[in-house]
């Protein structure tokens, strides 16, 4: 779909192998997956680092929701003051030259704002306070937010994005959540 939960739990930073369906990096330089010990997750390919942890604590400053009325992100610390844990933590690290070499259709360079806006566009239509509210999308977006635990931009040089989620796939490669934008910020 072009809207709804697919916008904030996946994207074009990866591409699918046409025979196996496993993800390969398309726009990311490297990735790391940490999953909760005991989950049935197995890596097949060697392009990502895979670790286990007894507990994955979501940082308080991770963005977990969007306040359409105030036009601001809601952090984990604000929404879950007692803390939040996740089943998986995905880290996507983009190439050092991402902002110089990747261009949009009009020639403008991709920017951090494009990544941030992609997350907003994935959630905003579910918010009744939003001028973009769409009741037909709200249920699927809200369903995705139940297992979504947060995004956090930890660096812009190189761009490094952490994602936290409770939904997981048995194939480690399919748990990388790159937040790749589908359109430029200015659209």
Protein language model regions, located:
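The feature preferentially marks the first beta-strand/turn patch immediately downstream
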Residues: 1-122, 126-187
């Amino acid at each position: 779909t072009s809207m709804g939960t697919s916008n904030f739990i996946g994207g074009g930073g990866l591409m699918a192998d046409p025979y196996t369906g496993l993800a390969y990096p398309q726009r990311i330089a490297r990735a790391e997956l940490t999953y909760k010990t005991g989950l049935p997750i197995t890596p097949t390919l060697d392009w990502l680092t895979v670790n286990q942890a007894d507990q994955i604590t979501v940082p308080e400053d991770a963005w977990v929701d969007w306040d359409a009325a105030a036009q601001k992100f809601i952090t984990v610390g604000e929404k879950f003051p007692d803390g939040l844990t996740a089943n998986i933590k995905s880290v996507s690290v983009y190439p050092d030259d991402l902002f110089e070499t990747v261009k949009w259709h009009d020639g403008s360079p991709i920017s951090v704002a494009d990544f941030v806006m992609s997350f907003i566009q994935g959630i905003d239509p579910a918010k009744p306070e939003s001028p973009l509210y769409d009741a037909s999308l709200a249920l699927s977006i809200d369903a995705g937010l139940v297992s979504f635990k947060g995004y956090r931009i930890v660096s812009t040089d190189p761009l490094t994005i952490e994602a936290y989620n409770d939904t997981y796939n048995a194939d480690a490669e399919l748990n990388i959540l790159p937040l790749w934008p589908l359109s430029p910020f200015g659209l």
